[in-house]
From Swiss-Prot:
Residues 1-23 form the signal peptide. GO terms for molecular function: N4-(beta-N-acetylglucosaminyl)-L-asparaginase activity; peptidase activity. It comes from the Eukaryota. Its EC number is 3.5.1.26. This is Putative N(4)-(beta-N-acetylglucosaminyl)-L-asparaginase GE19290.
Length: 396
């Protein structure tokens, strides 16, 4: 009996050793090609695949919405100040978004853009730490140019998540930021032209006098329930890149520490007091070191109702690749708003990323990482299909 037992144990041991040896010879180490999901649509990524780079070469990374190159380059330079970007992701995101504020990117970020109905520019911004899940945000910030840096002070020096309006400005003053006008000759001319054209377009509905031909002041107009959908469609403000935009940025180091941030001056000719999606956690941006991060841009009044950045991160948590997560998140919105315009970038903790967009011709975004073919920083573009229940995606 003992001899029989020893023989069985010997056979099991031999089989285990053989299988282990076979696995070592037939299971290659993960490469960039096996790490990516979906079909590549850019030359840079195709070259990276052919080069057979390992997944570890995807990090560190900086990625942001739109072709805001200077912001990305600065964030990448800051991220690279330490090996692998360690302890620099927050600095990278804050300084990258701050660069866009100073450059007044597309006149939709920073001072001197998107005046509201009274001709004033106000700012929204947010920073989120994917390790602690802490957020610092400001909304409707007045007379302070450094919105993203004030948001950082909210994160680091208060137990709150968001400060708004004049009180946020007073907090900024207490933290050492100087008050100054955010109005420029360009933004003043923009507002004067708008008022000369009977305040068209605007964001009012179900009021009198008719907001399509008048500047107001307005009063509520009773609307029969049967006409509500008709009036909503008729009065919708056409959202486009030049009147409604955000920089959303994500930075990840080699240990998958993540920060995400946003900055914007909101919708042009907005009703004073309006806040969009950018400073709202889960809407404008969301980050979780266990999974990844996402940033959004587009029609913030619609997007904040669906928390698309949170949806994308949770889809990745459930196992979806970044591109599929971004698409799924946008489809949730599109089912309810066929005229919606927006885009989303999703990145997992390993540096794999995807983008989806709707309602535009195309959506450009900037990426800096070791996986670049002709250097770390490159512009990626995804084509969008507008006016149909369909989304083009690009995944890497």
């Amino acid at each position: 009996m003992k001899r029989h037992l020893k023989a069985c144990l010997w056979v099991l041991c031999f089989a285990s050793t053989a299988l282990s040896s076979l696995a070592d010879t037939t299971s290659p180490k993960p490469t960039l090609a096996s790490a990516f999901s979906g079909k590549s649509k850019t030359t840079a990524v195709s070259t990276a695949l052919k080069a057979n780079k390992t997944a570890s070469e995807l990090l560190p990374m900086v990625i942001n919405t739109w072709n805001f190159t200077a912001a990305n380059v600065l964030a990448w330079r800051i991220l690279k100040q330490s090996k692998g970007g360690l302890r620099q992701t927050r600095n990278a995101v804050v300084e990258g978004c701050s660069k866009c504020e100073k450059l007044q990117c597309d006149r939709t970020v920073g001072y001197g853009g998107s005046p509201d109905e009274l001709g004033e520019t106000t700012l929204d911004a947010m920073v989120m730490d994917g390790a602690t899940m802490e957020v610092g945000a400001v909304a409707g910030l007045r007379r302070i140019k450094d919105a993203i840096k004030v948001a950082r002070h909210v994160l680091e020096h208060t137990q709150h998540t968001m400060l708004v309006g004049d009180a946020a400005s007073a907090f900024a003053n207490a933290m050492g930021f100087e008050s100054e006008s955010l109005v420029t000759p360009e933004s003043k001319d923009m507002w004067l032209q708008w008022t000369a054209e009977n305040c068209q377009p605007n964001f009012w509905k179900n009021v009198h006098p008719d907001p399509k031909v008048s500047c107001g002041p307005y009063k509520p107009r009773p609307t029969p329930l049967t006409r509500w959908k008709e009036d909503r469609a008729r009065n919708e403000y056409e959202i486009g890149r030049k009147n409604h935009d955000t920089i959303g940025m994500i930075a990840i180091d080699v240990e998958s520490n993540i920060h995400a941030g946003t900055s914007t001056n909101g919708a042009r000719h907005k009703i004073p007091g309006r806040v969009g999606d950018s400073p709202i956690p889960g809407a404008g941006a969301y980050a979780d070191n266990e999974v990844g991060a996402a940033v959004a841009t587009g029609d913030g009044d619609v997007m904040m109702r669906f928390l698309p950045s949170l949806l994308a991160v949770e889809a990745m948590r459930a196992g979806k690749p970044p591109a599929d997560a971004a698409e799924e998140s946008l489809r949730r919105i599109i089912r309810h708003h066929k005229d919606f315009m927006g885009a989303l970038i999703a990145v997992d903790r390993l540096g794999r990323y995807g983008a989806a967009c709707y309602g535009l011709d195309e959506f450009p975004f900037m990426v800096s990482s070791p996986a670049g073919r002709d250097g770390p920083t490159r512009l990626e573009t995804v084509k969008c299909i507008a006016g149909q229940d369909k989304v083009n995606i690009v995944s890497f």
